Amino acid sequence: MTTVTVTTEVPSSGKTEDGHVFCDSSSAHIIEETEYVRQMRTTLEKIRNHMFKEKEGCGNARHKLDAEGSGNIQNGSDSTTDPTCLDLLMENMRRKDQQLLEMNRENEVLQIKLEASREAGAAALRNVAQRLFDNYQTQAGDLEKKHEGRKHLLQVNNLEKEQALKGSAESLNLLSEKLEEKHGQIVGLENRVQRMENEKKTLLEKKLRLESKLFQLKSNAANPKSCQDLQTEISILQEQISHLQFVIHSQHQNLRSIIQEMEGLKNTLKEQDTKIENLKEKVTVLEAQNKELKTRVAHWTETPRTLVSKAVSTSELKTEGASPYLMLIRLRK
């Protein structure tokens, strides 16, 4: 008679490179133990069938001996059956019954150990799954906090860029208004200078006529008073022409100054346009990064639930007739 002692040790846990944890040594031990129990069951079934056949053979022999004894009694024969054969058969039957009883007990013990191994494997897997869940929850929380911090920083930068963009747009509008104002001033000055030039031309023509008239009067030696009046009028015209010339020169200087200011405003306007374009590009990049962070946060928020659903399958582990090997196979799928 063979006595089988099965010792099961379930280690705590082990980690793989991708973060999943499995009881490798415990799984191998459970697989070997399950295979050994299966072989023992097969052997016990064969022994039981063999014993039943021997018991049936002994029963047939006993029935044959009883029949022979009855025949001898009916025939009045003085011969009797051999008691040694019956004793041997009975002893053999008792021994086989005892062996069968012990084997049944061993089978029950093995069944209990197998159930205990299953329960231990299931408990270990549940423990591993819980640790995985806690690990994923911690990682998800840390990543979510990290991404939320980056998201807040990006939002602050985005707000600053938007405010700078708004300020640049306002400055651009002010520059445009100043350019319009300067353009109006230039047009007004040009018109004014043109009128002064026309007036100067008129005064010069009038002065030439008066000088020609004065020359004729002097040639004829006419009325001296008329000559004096003409000279006075010519002097007044000359003063007016000189004043107009001074004003025209001043207006030309103002016009050049305004044109220079306008050119400076145009350059500033171009710089503001470039700055606004750069700010728009930065705002677009920040918005894209913000969107990407939102996607990552959503992904890391949903990922632990999916992974836990793969690791925790205790309902399948408790199904009747499932071996620890099958439980590990289901967990790894």
From Swiss-Prot:
Function: Centriolar protein required for centriole subdistal appendage assembly and microtubule anchoring in interphase cells. Together with CCDC120, cooperate with subdistal appendage components ODF2, NIN and CEP170 for hierarchical subdistal appendage assembly.
Biological processes per GO annotation: microtubule anchoring at centrosome; protein localization
Keywords, alphabetical: Coiled coil, Cytoplasm, Cytoskeleton
Subcellular location: Cytoplasm, Cytoskeleton, Microtubule organizing center, Centrosome, Centriole
Quaternary structure and partners: Interacts with CEP170.
Protein origin, superkingdom: Eukaryota
A cellular component term, taken from the record's GO annotations: cytoplasm
Presence of the UniProt keyword Nuclease in the record: no
Chief location of this protein within or outside the cell: cytoplasm
Protein name as catalogued: Coiled-coil domain-containing protein 68
Residue ranges the record marks as coiled coil: 86-120, 160-302
